[in-house]
A protein has these predicted regions:
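Conserved acidic
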Residues: 1-478
Length: 478
């Protein structure tokens, strides 16, 4: 390494297990490593880009080790490509904001700084109440991951969930995906702090008077007896792996927290009605409480700025080098997604290098041991109490709103009218197709056995006009 190097970006195909390359592989190598280097911090969670911060003990020089995948996910770049992409991305961002700008090591930190720079003057960035913020964090899913096909393991299912497609061969595999869904979901008022905790009566009155008001509701609901489709309201799992499920078994009752958009969709679909001897009867969803957000528009300008950056990248490179365009636009979209998650960041995970298992303090609870390929413990991870978050940028209520709006849009999405170019009166999405053709929902992607017309390009009579937030066909396998 050059004696002034402060950043090392690892490129190419990188192993999924960061301990296989970021940490010494034996206790002996650990002792040798610790003679020369001090570990300032490690981030090593499976499935996430690894980072390491080190200080050379003799020269007191700091060195950060990153992976190119953190900024450019899904792109296997050479060092030359990574250097070019880093510089070009820096130029595009600086051009759009019209000032000198250095690209930060992490896309989330970069996005947060751009958000603070582009936040409208009308938004005062009121801090989120820590207790309400924590409540929102613990009651809000991000993506929806759901296999709709019978996998043959009923013992692993939640009592209130059932597959809607039997096991068996399928005629086709169709991949429908949302285009930059988070950006496309920012169409109305997102809302933000200050937030107000509501009683059951106050929550009921707010939703009745203004169902579109940015809010979260604590409700008790029962899946209608006539329902025969995927579920609409998220509930935390109680068995099997952690996460969420969407109850769809008629007659099952649950309590949960939902976003206003999710609740409105459920009621629009008739979840407040039930069969009676003389026809449908009202069976209201019961309100148990709520959290009311303030009507503000905290991120639309920031989202528009990132969309402008994507346009700049496409105009500069689309005709010259489509691969370059993909690298740059994917990085910018990734920055927005990661930044939304950064707004709801939880307690950090600390990774500590050890010589052997006896070096782990006896009072450390709930740690995960990291082992090398021979089974020796070389480090351990544990969750640490979060430092006081930046009150300007810790906004789990904003993240929860965008996640919920994106989930709703995947189920019930606006489509373009091919004759007028405006939004059609009909909708697309997972709820607007034959449920027996629905294989799975994976975030803002839908896997199905038939091509939905609304997911085709406008030129082919469909509803995809190329705008962000549209669901469109990405691939078909016979």
């Amino acid at each position: 390494l050059h004696h002034n190097a402060r950043r090392l970006i690892v490129c190419g195909n990188i192993p999924d297990q960061p301990q296989s390359w970021l940490l010494p592989d034996t206790p002996a190598h650990t002792r040798e490593f610790n003679q020369d280097w001090h570990v300032r911090g490690l981030f090593m969670l499976v499935g996430r880009p690894a980072r390491g911060r080190f200080t050379h003990k003799e020269t007191d020089r700091n060195l950060d080790i990153l992976v190119a995948d953190e900024w450019f996910p899904g792109q296997t770049l050479t060092p030359v490509q990574a250097r070019w992409a880093w510089r070009e991305l820096t130029h595009i961002i600086a051009t759009r904001i019209d000032r000198d700008w250095a690209l930060m090591d992490r896309p989330g930190a970069e996005g947060i700084n751009l958000w603070k720079l582009r936040t409208p003057e009308s938004y005062l960035m009121e801090p989120m109440d820590p207790e309400l913020g924590a409540l929102i964090q613990h009651t809000s899913p991000q993506h929806r991951y759901e296999l709709c096909v019978d996998d043959g393991h009923p013992e692993d299912r939640e009592q209130g969930w059932r597959p809607i497609v039997p096991a068996g061969p399928i005629p086709n595999f169709v991949y429908v995906d949302g285009r930059f869904m988070y950006a496309g979901s920012v169409t109305g008022e997102i809302g933000a702090a200050p937030a107000t905790l509501l009683s059951a009566t106050e929550a009921h009155d707010l939703f009745t008077d203004d169902p579109w008001h940015p809010a979260r509701y604590h409700v008790r609901f029962t899946v209608p007896s006539w329902w025969d489709d995927i579920g609409l309201l998220p509930v935390k799992r109680t068995k099997g792996r952690a996460g969420w499920f969407w109850p769809n078994v008629p007659g099952t009752t649950y309590e949960t927290w939902v976003d206003a958009a999710e609740l409105k969709l459920a009621i629009d679909e008739g979840w407040d009605t039930e069969f009676g001897p003389d026809g449908p009867v009202t069976k209201p969803i019961e309100f148990l409480g709520g959290i009311k957000l303030t009507k503000v528009d905290p991120i639309r300008g920031w989202v528009k700025t990132i969309q402008d950056m994507i346009d700049i990248a496409e105009k500069r490179w689309a005709d010259k080098n489509p691969t370059a365009t993909t690298i740059l636009t994917s990085a910018l979209k990734n920055m927005l997604r990661v930044t939304i998650g950064q707004m709801s960041a939880s307690n950090p995970v600390t990774t500590t290098v050890v010589y052997d298992a006896d070096d782990i303090p006896s009072d450390t609870e709930g740690f995960d041991a990291i082992r090398n390929k021979t089974g020796d413990i070389v480090a351990y991870q544990y969750e640490t109490a979060r430092r006081r978050p930046d009150p300007d940028t810790w906004h789990p209520e904003i993240a929860a709103r965008i996640w919920a709006l994106s989930r709703v849009r995947t189920l019930n999405t606006p489509i373009a009218d091919p004759t007028t170019g405006k939004n059609a009166t009909t909708k697309g999405g997972a709820l607007r197709m034959n449920s027996r053709s629905l294989l799975a929902i994976h975030g803002d992607a839908i896997y199905t056995t038939s091509v939905p017309t609304w997911a085709l390009p406008v030129a082919q009579g469909g509803g995809d006009d190329g705008k962000d937030g549209r669901l469109r066909v990405k691939g078909v396998l016979p």
